[in-house]
Amino acid sequence: MHLVGGGLSDDDTPLLARFLSEATTRATAAARLEPARVAVVLVHDGLGAEEFDRYAAALRSAGACEPFAVLAPEGGSFAVAQLQDVDGIVVGGGLTPAYRQALEPVFGEIRRQVTAGVPYAGFSAGAAVAAETAIVGGWRIGDVEVVQESASEDLDEVTVEQGIGLIDVAVDVHAAQWGTLTRLIAATEAGLVEGGVAIDEGTVLIVGEGQLVVEGRGSVWSVIGSETGVTVSSAGAS
């Protein structure tokens, strides 16, 4: 599983290299003759085709593959049939509550496929909703501001909802750029989540069977709760 702390940018193609390698391995194991089929899952506000073209170009720059679009408008939802016969799943960035709502009908299917070995890459919203307990937005807890309002995702109160369930800790994104590390710290202290990771833009956290791997130009911040408060640490690319 590959969790990227921001939406796709022009500098992010290298972050897709290991994901695409895993998808290619999956295609080979399935005896697929054509390149790896990668579902690009996007929730959009009218520019879905243009956004898909950006992701498809980045994937093809990272290696041979066959990206295909799985699109839903904000307020819509996805169906299990749209995610069949895939070697990799990319979930893009955008309004996190809209992504969570659209993906909810296929949470179980995505978990099933990832368990079966299909690699998952989430950018921004796609990383946040990968968690079992997902922070979908908000900038205040009660009357206390915990992050800048511009990071609220159109929500007032910090909101935690069921996510896909690919990782058992919360994930926040745009950590250094939007200051969302403080939201994760506050949510942990308030007992909304049991801890988690906050990922910088341009940075990917790779979660697999072995040791966690960080790649890219930023850091991944780990927040662990305890009876006496929280512990925060960071890790960069090694």
Label each region the model flagged.
Residues 83-84, 114:
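A short, aliphatic-rich alpha-helical micro-motif
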Residues 90-92, 114-135:
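Catalytic nucleophile loop
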Residues 11, 99-100, 131, 138:
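Glycine/Thr-rich phosphate-binding loops of Rossmann-like dinucleotide-binding domains
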Residues 91-97, 169-171:
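Short, basic, glycine/proline-bearing loop/turn elements
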Residues 65-80:
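A short, well-structured beta->alpha microelement
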Residues 37, 87-88:
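Structural motif
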Residues 1-33, 40-53, 57, 61, ...:
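C-terminal and late-domain segments of enzyme folds
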Residues 96-105:
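Glycine/threonine-rich flexible loop motifs
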